[in-house]
Amino acid sequence: MVRISGFCCAMSLAERQAALLVLADGSVFHGYACGAAGTVIGEVVFNTGMTGYQEVLTDPSYCGQIVSFTYPELGNTGVNPEDEESARPQVSGLIARNVARRHSNWRADRSLPDYLQQHNIVGIYGIDTRALTQHLRSTGAMNGGISTTILDPEELWAEVKAAPSMEGLNLVDQVTTDRPYEWQTPTSQTWEFIEGPTTESLTVVAIDFGVKRNILRRLASYGCRVIVVPADTPIEEILRHEPDGVFLSNGPGDPATVKNGISTAQALLQTGLPLFGICLGHQILGSALGAQTFKLKFGHRGLNHPCGLSQQVEITGQNHGFAIAADSLGPDVEVTHLNLNDRTVAGLRHRHLPVFSVQYHPEASPGPHDSDYLFEQFVALMRDRQPTPVA
């Protein structure tokens, strides 16, 4: 086993509780507890964003993962209810260089450590996250474990090695809604970045594979009536809502395992309805069109990934560990965006059907707003498909 020492943050020795991080390859990181006591196992990944830790922690796409934040300071702005992307934290655990015990933000109602403890999330700080990131970048994302109760590296390592790999894992059932509902949360926030038109009167059915709240906000801000349905909803039930379009949401896990979602997307393609997919929804839509997916070495998780194809580059927020294989796309599918860091497929559309998707997150939260126009494109497809009223 390889022992990698951690750093200490500026706290008294009496306040520190020892914690341990062990990776599947035997690497050991010593640090200090932050949040709940206990042991968690998950896929260890890194996020390079400098802001938006609360949105990351509550993003359902991170279900089953232990997230290491490369930015060294975490928690300075506390936690507030408005910035949550779901009802609770979705990560398995948190890794940080330093976590602020005191926060300064007029919107915050609690500290990050208190929030983690409240929701039973195990965290570790005092870790050399730069060394950890470089290690994961070289070897690839892998399972790991954080513990405040098992401080013997060999014992924790045994638990880590027994855990299933993310590849082949279906986590959608853990994050999808258990019943249909209409999205009704107000969208008029003083800090919202764009005000879209609100007179479309279009109905969108959003298939919830782990949807973020800000996606629903953006759809609603364009005047859409948004009905959210569980991931395994049959197409007959989807069509009963008489949608003008169907949205396939983001979510966690291996897209190849979401068989119900892929078969539903295949059936939706036969209806001619406008379809829009984001992240996991993009992968599911690509799979429904005959493409194959594969696991990335360490994934794309951050707020500054450049995407484009020819004349225009968009800076995007991303969070995924799988991608569509470009050479598996059929002649009827056109690649619209590439991730310009590694040339993986970042967007596609059907040449003859009103169907498109992107691998990244145009809704931001957190992230740049370069790609918000995609919601407008989806609305335009639905509007153009509607019959013209008789005068």
Swiss-Prot record:
Active site positions: 279 (nucleophile), 361, 363
Residues annotated for L-glutamine binding in this entry: 61, 251, 253, 280, 283, 319, 321-322
GO molecular function, one term: ATP binding
Pathway(s) it belongs to: Amino-acid biosynthesis; L-arginine biosynthesis; carbamoyl phosphate from bicarbonate: step 1/1; Pyrimidine metabolism; UMP biosynthesis via de novo pathway; (S)-dihydroorotate from bicarbonate: step 1/3
Keywords: Amino-acid biosynthesis, Arginine biosynthesis, ATP-binding, Glutamine amidotransferase, Ligase, Nucleotide-binding, Pyrimidine biosynthesis
Catalytic activity: hydrogencarbonate + L-glutamine + 2 ATP + H2O = carbamoyl phosphate + L-glutamate + 2 ADP + phosphate + 2 H(+)
Documented EC number(s): 6.3.5.5
Keyword Translocase belongs to the record: no
Region (CPSase): 1-199
One Pfam assignment: CPSase_sm_chain
First-tier enzyme category under EC: ligase
Domain Glutamine amidotransferase type-1: 203-388
GO terms, biological process: 'de novo' pyrimidine nucleobase biosynthetic process; 'de novo' UMP biosynthetic process; glutamine metabolic process; L-arginine biosynthetic process
Keyword Nucleotide-binding annotated: yes
Subunit structure: Composed of two chains; the small (or glutamine) chain promotes the hydrolysis of glutamine to ammonia, which is used by the large (or ammonia) chain to synthesize carbamoyl phosphate. Tetramer of heterodimers (alpha,beta)4.
Function, in words: Small subunit of the glutamine-dependent carbamoyl phosphate synthetase (CPSase). CPSase catalyzes the formation of carbamoyl phosphate from the ammonia moiety of glutamine, carbonate, and phosphate donated by ATP, constituting the first step of 2 biosynthetic pathways, one leading to arginine and/or urea and the other to pyrimidine nucleotides. The small subunit (glutamine amidotransferase) binds and cleaves glutamine to supply the large subunit with the substrate ammonia.
Record family assignment: Belongs to the CarA family.
PANTHER family reported for this sequence: CARBAMOYL-PHOSPHATE SYNTHASE SMALL CHAIN, MULTIFUNCTIONAL TRYPTOPHAN BIOSYNTHESIS PROTEIN-RELATED
Protein name in the entry: Carbamoyl phosphate synthase small chain
Species this protein is from: Synechococcus sp. (strain ATCC 27144 / PCC 6301 / SAUG 1402/1)
Gene giving rise to this polypeptide: carA
